[in-house]
A protein has these predicted regions:
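Short, charged beta->alpha transition segments
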Residues: 18, 50-53, 100-105, 126-128, ...
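Surface-exposed amphipathic alpha-helical tracts and adjacent flexible/coil segments at the periphery
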Residues: 1-12, 17-23, 28-35, 60-70, ...
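Glycine-rich, positively charged N-terminal anion/phosphate-binding segment
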Residues: 39-58
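Well-ordered mid-protein domain cores that form the structural environment of catalytic cofactors
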Residues: 78-118, 123-124, 130
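Alpha-helix capping and helix-loop boundary segments enriched in small/acidic/polar residues
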Residues: 41, 119-123, 142, 260
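Short gly/ser-rich anion-binding loops that grip negatively charged ligand groups
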Residues: 40-43, 69-77, 92-96
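Short, cationic motifs built from Arg/Lys/His that form the positively charged side of catalytic pockets
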Residues: 54-55, 107, 155
Length: 339
C-alpha cells in the first residue's frame, strides 16, 4: 500500500536545537521569538537571530514555523503588528496562532505567512476545524485528547485543502490542551503565556484538614504520590496508523528539551517515515533509540482510548548521556569530535 509522507515538524528552542533538528531530518521546525510564544524558558530567538535562523533552515530545504500562540492581554496587542511584520520580513513560512485577534492581525501584518491554528485552541471536532479554514487557516493542530477514530472523522468532514497536524511524541498535559491555571495559582507563572511551572508534576500527599501532619496511606514512594502525573507520548510504533488516519504533519514536542533530544527523536521518526514511504520493514532500532533520551514512561496518548497515568513518581528516565558531538567529517571519513 502506497502511503503519503507527512511533514515531520521538530522543536527548535534555540540555535543548538535548530541545527540538530535540521541535521537529523526535520522537514520543518517550530520556534519562537522573544514574545508571544508558549515556551518562555526555551531560549528562543531574538529579532536579530530570527532571519539567520530562517536562512539556515531554508538553505537546507527546511521550513520554519513560528509560535505566536499565547493569549495576549489588551495591553500587549499593540505590540503584535510590529512583531508580525518582523516575522513576515524574515521569511517565516507559517505562524502558529491560538488567539482569534492575533490570527486576524497575522493576516494583515504577515500576509506571506501561512496561519496554523495552535493546539491551544483545543480543536476537537470537524465543525471547529472547518470554521478556522473558512477564516483563512491553512492548517489546524488538533487537540492531543483525540482518538484516531476522531481524527479520521475530522479528516473526512473537512476540506481536503485544510492540513491536519497532530503531536506524535513528547510530554502531555494533565489539562485540556494546556488550558490550565494550576501554575498561575501556585506559583504566579501563567501557563497560557508560556511560563508553566508544571505543578502537575509536583509531589503531593493527602491530609485531612483537622488532622495536620497525619497523612493518608496513598504514597507510592517515600516522598508522596503523583496523582496528576501523565506519561509521555510515543507513537513511533504507530506512525503508519497516523498517516492512514489522514494526518498531514507529525509534530514532536520539546522546545524546552535538549539538543540531544531534538536530534535523537527527529532522527528516529525520520527513519520510520522514510521506511514506511519506501515500503520497507521498520527497523526496531528506532524504537530503542527514543528510549535513549530523557523521558517519562511512554504511552500512546489518547489515540487508542484513555491513556494511563503513572503514579509512582515524576522522575525522568535518564539512562543514557551524550558523550560527544561529531562536528565535521572529511572525504576520507575522518571526523572532528567535540567532547
Amino acid at each position: 500500500m502506497e502511503r503519503k509522507k507527512p511533514e515531520l515538524l521538530s522543536p527548535a528552542g534555540d540555535w543548538e536545537k535548530l541545527k540538530m533538528a535540521v541535521a537529523y531530518g526535520a522537514d520543518a521546525v517550530y520556534l519562537a521569538g522573544t514574545a508571544f510564544g508558549m515556551r518562555s524558558f526555551a531560549g528562543n530567538f531574538t529579532d536579530e537571530e530570527l532571519p539567520r535562523a530562517v536562512k539556515h533552515a531554508h538553505d537546507r530545504g527546511v521550513k520554519v514555523h513560528v509560535t505566536v500562540n499565547t493569549m495576549p492581554r489588551s495591553g500587549e496587542v499593540e505590540q503584535l503588528p510590529a512583531h508580525l511584520e518582523r516575522l513576515n520580513d524574515a521569511g517565516v513560512d507559517a505562524l502558529i496562532v491560538a488567539d482569534l485577534g492575533a490570527f486576524t492581525l497575522a493576516g494583515k501584518y504577515a500576509p506571506r505567512c501561512q496561519r496554523h491554528i495552535s493546539t491551544q485552541q483545543s480543536i476537537a471536532n470537524y465543525a471547529s476545524a472547518a470554521a478556522w479554514y473558512d477564516l483563512g487557516a491553512t492548517r489546524v493542530v488538533l487537540a492531543r485528547e483525540l482518538s484516531l477514530d476522531e481524527i479520521r472523522t475530522i479528516r473526512a468532514k473537512t476540506p481536503k485543502e485544510l492540513e491536519i497536524e497532530t503531536f506524535c511524541h513528547g510530554a502531555m498535559c494533565v489539562s485540556y490542551s494546556g488550558r490550565c491555571l494550576l501554575s498561575n495559582y501556585m506559583t504566579g507563572r501563567d501557563a497560557n503565556r508560556g511560563q508553566c511551572a508544571q505543578p502537575c508534576r509536583y509531589q503531593y500527599a493527602l491530609m485531612e484538614e483537622k488532622r495536620p501532619g497525619e497523612y493518608f496511606p496513598v504514597f507510592e514512594d517515600e516522598k508522596g504520590t503523583y496523582i496528576m502525573n501523565s506519561r509521555d507520548m510515543c507513537t513511533i510504533d504507530h506512525v503508519a496508523e497516523l498517516i492512514d488516519a489522514g494526518v498531514d504533519c507529525l509534530k514532536i514536542e520539546g522546545r524546552a528539551k535538549s539538543g540531544y533530544y531534538a536530534a535523537i527523536v527527529t532522527g528516529a521518526y525520520r527513519h520510520v517515515l522514510d521506511d514506511i514511504a519506501a515500503g520497507r520493514p521498520i527497523d526496531p532500532v528506532w524504537r530503542d533509540e527514543v528510549e535513549h533520551v530523557s523521558h517519562r514512561h511512554y504511552s500512546t496518548g489518547f489515540f487508542y482510548g484513555q491513556p494511563g497515568q503513572y503514579y509512582d513518581n515524576a522522575r525522568y528516565i535518564r539512562d543514557w548521556q551524550i558523550c560527544a558531538v561529531v562536528t565535521d567529517c572529511d572525504e576520507n571519513g575522518l571526523a572532528t569530535v567535540s567532547l
